């Protein structure tokens, strides 16, 4: 009996040691994970601070004037474009290609440096020849100087204020911000500010060319289920439209046949 008891005690010691080692290892893993999370948070804060510093044109009117001057200097005199965008860290614009007037090219200023020109694929419906494309593009271009961009910092603050007052969405200066002025696919001019919250909800302020407010809305967070339902509704509506057109065509054909019978 004593021999068995002694053996049990001898076994208990290494088991206790192993358990203590495992607990210590788990604690070390937790500490390592906590340290990694802290380092990740610090890294993200540095990135955010850098983006903020490189996006002062969003918050300061004088900095916006510098950005406008920078775009004008890069684009050349009487700059005509089909799109300009301001985003966290920089801005970009798309102009008519100097060497190939039927095509367009993009210039992008990011992290303090210009990139481009880079070719952009442009589809203009109803055009076939290069001359037709060039003419259609000419009609779509608008003068960069015709848009009041200096008002952007003020309008961003107004958008943030309205968004937070709604109680539906919460945004700050550090939220994702995009300002665009462009000719949309339907040929209409669009000038707006979009601020996206962490939950992907968006506050959108639409502006006129002179910088006055044309509209404001809050768009719901992205919901895959709702988006799928919308897509299904569009498909169903398209089917109904096709069926309606088919019936009209059949009715018209029947009228023609009846006329010939007479």
From Swiss-Prot:
Record field: transmembrane:
none
Tell me which residues bear the N-palmitoyl cysteine lipid modification: 26
Q: Its GO CC terms?
A: plasma membrane
Chief location of this protein within or outside the cell? membrane
Swiss-Prot/TrEMBL keywords: Cell membrane, Lipoprotein, Membrane, Palmitate, Signal
Keyword Iron, does the record have it? no
Q: Where is this region: Disordered?
A: 227-262
Membrane topology term: Lipid-anchor
Signal peptide positions are 1-25
Composition bias (Basic and acidic residues) maps to 237-246
Protein name as catalogued: Probable lipoprotein EnvF
User: Origin organism of this chain?
Assistant: Salmonella typhimurium (strain LT2 / SGSC1412 / ATCC 700720)
Residues bearing a lipid moiety (S-diacylglycerol cysteine): 26
> Does the keyword Cell inner membrane feature in the UniProt annotation?
no
Annotated gene: envF
Cellular compartments annotated? Cell membrane
Q: Which cysteines are joined by disulfide bonds?
A: none
Q: The organism sits in which domain of life? A: Bacteria
């Amino acid at each position: 009996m004593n021999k068995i008891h002694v053996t049990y005690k001898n076994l208990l010691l290494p088991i206790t040691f192993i358990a203590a080692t495992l607990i210590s290892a788990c604690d070390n893993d937790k500490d390592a994970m906590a340290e990694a999370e802290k380092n990740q948070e610090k890294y993200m804060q540095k990135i955010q601070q850098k983006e903020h510093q490189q996006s002062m044109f969003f918050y300061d009117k004088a900095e916006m004037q510098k950005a406008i001057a920078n775009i004008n200097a890069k684009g050349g005199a009487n700059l005509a474009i089909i799109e300009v965008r301001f985003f966290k860290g920089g801005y970009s614009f798309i102009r008519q290609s100097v060497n190939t007037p039927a095509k367009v090219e993009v210039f992008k200023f990011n992290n303090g440096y210009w990139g481009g020109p880079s070719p952009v694929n442009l589809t203009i419906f109803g055009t076939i020849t290069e001359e037709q494309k060039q003419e259609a593009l000419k009609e779509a271009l608008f003068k960069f100087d015709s848009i009041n961009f200096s008002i952007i910092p003020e309008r961003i603050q107004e958008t943030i204020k309205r968004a937070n007052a709604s109680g539906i969405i919460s945004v700050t200066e550090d939220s994702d911000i995009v300002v665009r002025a462009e000719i949309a696919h339907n040929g209409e001019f669009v000038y707006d500010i979009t601020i996206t919250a962490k939950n992907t909800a968006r506050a959108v302020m639409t502006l006129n060319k002179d910088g006055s407010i044309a509209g404001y809305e809050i768009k719901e967070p992205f919901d895959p289920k709702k988006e799928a339902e919308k897509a299904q509704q569009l498909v169903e509506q398209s089917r109904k439209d096709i069926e309606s057109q088919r019936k009209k065509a059949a009715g018209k054909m029947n009228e023609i046949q009846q006329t010939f019978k007479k």
